[in-house]
Amino acid sequence: MESKQNRALKEFDSLYKMIDDVYHEIALSMHLTDSAFLILYCLLELGDGCSQKDICKLYSISKQTVNSSVKSLEDKGVLIRKAGVGRDIHLFFTEFGREFSEKHIGPVFDMEN
């Protein structure tokens, strides 16, 4: 017989998958990868100047994934990178990136809060 704890974990996993699918569809509708969406979302949440390391920790995304997405977003003129102390890289919106994020990602952020 399945324990209450196992049933609860299965239910949690199912809900997590459903939520993840919703965010995936939102990102696709904006022609963004999931990681690019999370980076822009994080910049809106934490503000200009957050580090790539902050994003990795906050969303449990690998450094390589964040770095690849940041490079792609930078190539598209959405954000810029600036060196920080040591090896830290800080991210800042371009004017286009801020407008895009506030228009498209801002409503998602507002809906959650």
Regions found by a protein language model. Give the residues of each.
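N-terminal leader segment of winged-helix/HTH proteins
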Residues: 1-30, 78, 99
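Membrane-interacting alpha-helical segments
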Residues: 2-6, 58, 62-63, 91-93
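N-terminal positioning helix adjacent to the helix-turn-helix/winged-helix DNA-binding module
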Residues: 4, 15, 22, 35-36, ...
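Residue-level recognition of specific faces of alpha-helices
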Residues: 11, 39-42, 107
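N-terminal helix-turn-helix DNA-binding core of bacterial DNA-binding proteins
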Residues: 21-65
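Charged, amphipathic alpha-helical coiled-coil/dimerization segments
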Residues: 71-113
